[in-house]
Amino acid sequence: MINRYSTQQFEWLDVTDLNSDEQQLLLEKHQIKQATLAYATDTHERARYSLDLLDNSEMIIFNIPQADKEHPNQFTISPITFLIKNQTLFSFHSKETSGLIKKILATESNDLPVDTFVLRVLFDGVQHYHQIIEHLSQQRDEFITKLDHRIQNRQLIGLSEIEKSLVYILSGTQTNLLLLKSLSKKHADLSNNKDNQKLIAKLLVEAKQAEQMAKISLDVTERLSATSNNLLNNNLNDTMKFLTVWSLVLTIPTITTGFYGMNTVLPFSKNPQTWVLICLITLLLMLLVLYYLKKHRFI
C-alpha cells in the first residue's frame, strides 16, 4: 500500500506491504533501481546510510523498536527505510511500525526541506528508544519488588523477557549510532546547511545516550536475573537438604522398632514397658544424628 502526502517542499510516498503492481510503479514511474528497492523492503536489513551521486538519491535505513503482537511489553527491532530521490521522499516499513509515521504526521511541520524533515524523524526515532528503555526499566523494577517478597517462576520469566528485549534494543541503538556517524561524515563533506549539521550533532548525542542507557539497563537486568536465579537455586538446595536430613532422621524409628518386630529373642522383649525404652532409645539416636549433622554444618 502506498499513501501519498504532500508538503510545501516535497512529496512523500509512504509504502507498507508492497505488492507487485506498486513495485512496478516505483520501478517505472519513479525510476527506483531494483537493487535499491530490494534493500529498502528487506525486513532484515541493517541500519546504514548510502549516497548514490549518479542516481541523485540518498538511502537511510534506521532501526526502531517494535512491540510484539501477542506480548505488547516485549520488543524487537524493525527497519524503516527513507529514500530521497529528486525531492521526493519514499518511506518503507512494516504495518507494525506505522505508529511512528502517525506521530510524524501529527507533530512535524510541513514546511521543512526533505533532508531536515528526515533528520527530525530520526530524532523522534531516537527519542522513542529512550521511552522504551525507561518503560522496560520500570517493568524490571516492578518484577524485582515482587521478587523481594517471594521468588516465583513468573517473575523470573518476566525478567528474562525484559532482558531479551533489551538485547534487541541495544543492538538497534548500536547500529543506529554507526548509521548516524556515517551520515554525519557525509553531510559534513557535502552539505553547507549548518542547521542540519547541528541537528545531526544533536542526534549523535541522543543516540549515544540511548546506547548507554540500553547498556546500563541490560547490565542491571542481567545481574538481577543472575542473582534471582542463584537465590532460587539456593532455596532449592535448602529444600533438598531439609528433606534429606529429615528423611535420614525419620528412618531411625523404623530401624529401631523393626528389630522388635522380628520373630527373634531380644532384650526386654517380654516386658510390657519395653515400648517406653524403645521410644527413649529412638529419641536419643535422633538427637545424636541431628547433633552430628549440625556440628558438621549439614544443617
Q: Where are the model-predicted features located?
A:
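Peripheral, non-transmembrane regulatory/ligand-interaction domains of membrane transport proteins
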Residues: M1-K185, N192, K202, E206-Q209, ...
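DNA-binding recognition helix and immediately preceding turn/loop
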Residues: Q155, N192-D195, S217, E222
